Amino acid sequence: MSEIRLNKKAYIHNLMQISNKAGGKERVMLVLKDNAYGHGAKLIAAAASEFGIKFCAVKSQSEALEIQRNFEKILILSHIANGDEDQNFIYAINDMKGLNRIKRGTRIHLVIDTNMHRNGLKFSELEAAFGPIKERGLALEGAYTHFRASDEMNADYFVQRQNFKEAKAEILRLCEKFAMPHPIFHSHNSAALERFGEFDDDMVRVGIAQHGYAQFDDSLNLKPVLSLWAQKVSERVLKAGQCVGYGAKFCADKDINIATYDLGYGDGLLRYAGDGELPLANGKAMLGKMSMDSFSCEDAGEWVCVFDDANVWARYFDTINYDILVKLSPNIKRKFV
């Protein structure tokens, strides 16, 4: 049976590095959406809670319910307001309609569109937003934005940061006008945390960095947490001239000992079609086309590490490490080691 092994020492190291850069554990909100980026939300939530993280963000209410006992506060990022919100959670408001559809008295964070144009209220909508917030008894606990290019060397980050600074000032003015408590503000994602040393927000909101993947530079000295392992199903000698797998994509030029391992694209891996060389963690190449539930390679023993750095697969498939990690099937066993 294939399995995902999570290095707990590496995870705690990453949390320590992030907390130190942010100015304390209390200033860190961990993003655990999509099964904690494929790592396993329940395991990661337990470890983060044990470390002392009190606040996390997830995609949906169903995700929040899975890890509710681990955190004091959970922000739901992608909820579509329906009037049936849970008072134990905090909900992101992604447009003006959400303010009128969400259950009265709900705890909310306003999303501010500072130039990404994906979700959020425009600056010009802020004053109008405070009407329904006040009238419907919504608890405005926070406001945030998302940087579209904090990992790129251009002016986008600085434009958005200035726009958010102006939005924060306007929100504070409106809080005074409507006699409401001041909310917390957050904007820095993993790349922004790595890139900049000064923060004028209350919290940072970190996703991929907790799992050991730097998005801008390696200043935090992060360590990958996840390694993917497959167990041997069978073994054989592939004779010179014989081919393995669908389409006979790999043919041996000499006798080699090969094995089939129990992991394939049905487990959430991008499908290797046998073109070029896709190295496993031991440096040996996958041989032939990947099957739905298995792949072949030179015999590496009872277990083989498929990867311990998602960047290797991301480079081969011309994608990003998020894409490799988040697709890993929730059916694969996960454990801390």
From Swiss-Prot:
| Entry keyword set | Isomerase, Pyridoxal phosphate
What residues form the membrane-spanning segments? none
Annotated GO CC locations? cytosol
The annotated pathway is: Amino-acid biosynthesis; D-alanine biosynthesis; D-alanine from L-alanine: step 1/1
Q: Do you know which Gene3D superfamilies this protein is assigned to?
A: Alanine racemase, Lyase, Ornithine Decarboxylase, Chain A, domain 1
Alphabetically, which GO biological process terms does the record hold?
A: D-alanine biosynthetic process
EC number(s) per entry? 5.1.1.1
The UniProt record gives the binding positions of substrate as: 118, 292
What cofactors are annotated for this protein?
A: pyridoxal 5'-phosphate
Q: Where is the active site?
A: 33 (proton acceptor), 246 (proton acceptor)
InterPro entries under this entry?
Ala_racemase, Ala_racemase/Decarboxylase_C, Ala_racemase_C, Ala_racemase_N, Ala_racemase_pyridoxalP-BS, PLP-binding_barrel
GO MF:
alanine racemase activity; pyridoxal phosphate binding
N6-(pyridoxal phosphate)lysine occurs at 33
Q: Which reaction does it catalyse?
A: L-alanine = D-alanine
Q: What does this protein do?
A: Catalyzes the interconversion of L-alanine and D-alanine. May also act on other amino acids.
Give the protein family. Belongs to the alanine racemase family.
Instruction: Return the protein name.
Output: Alanine racemase
Q: Which organism is it from?
A: Campylobacter curvus (strain 525.92)
Gene coding for it: alr
